Amino acid sequence: MVIIFLTACSAHQKKILIYANSKIQVDESQKNITVEDGTTQVEKELNFSGSDPVVLVVNSPRGNYSIEAPEDGYWLANLGTDTVVGSLQHTGSIRQTRVTQEQLQVQLDSLNKLVKGANISEAAKNYFIIPGKIAKITSLTGAKIFGPYTPVPSAFDAGSVPEVYKFYDIGEVYDIIHKLTEMSKYKYEKESGKTEDDDDSVYTIHPTKK
């Protein structure tokens, strides 16, 4: 019975990924965090065992405050100056080579809702984390999170981890929305000699006529 109890206790794990805009200083307990002003995206990962809630005390240029991870799982703490948004990535072996105007509009609608914090839910696996807050991303501490300004490498093996998440600084998302909006102003025509079933076909782009 004692062995079972010890095994159960050792299974508890809390992983906290910290985002900040400058150097992150952590004391030996990993529970007292100091961040400074800056403009460079910095990440630091902290690991904790045990069933007790983890409370981090943060000392920052915007004041002192605490954040808490009350249960096991993978958490994201935003100690930066901008909101970060992100979601679960649906990975697979099929590569889509074309995007229709309808699909483009769906992406735009989704991104516009995301930057407003709309339709955010645990069930949808999407997140809107304002500065100074922490959120549980997943119960799977073996998941992989790619942070702001860090693209998912083309050679990354998504099968090596149970889940993949991508997060963006909210400014990045506005840039993406702008680019997609510009793309939505164009129409695509099939290159001469190509068929509708040819996934490798090339399209000629023309400005959409009003």
Q: Can you say where each PLM-predicted feature lies in the sequence?
A:
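C-terminal motif of bacterial Sec signal peptides marking the signal peptidase cleavage site
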Residues: F5-A8
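Bacterial signal peptide processing site
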Residues: S10-H12
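Structural motif
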Residues: I16-Q25
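Short, solvent-exposed S/T- and G/P-enriched segments that are highly enriched in secreted/extracellular
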Residues: K31-F48
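Solvent-exposed, non-transmembrane interaction/regulatory regions
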Residues: G38-T39, N59-Y65
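Short Pro-Gly-centered beta-turn/loop motif in secreted/extracellular proteins
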Residues: K44-V57, E68-D72
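Extracellular beta-sheet/turn segments enriched in Thr/Pro/Gly and aliphatic residues
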Residues: Y65-K116, E163-K210
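Extended, compositionally biased alpha-helical segments that mediate assembly or anchoring
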Residues: A118-P162
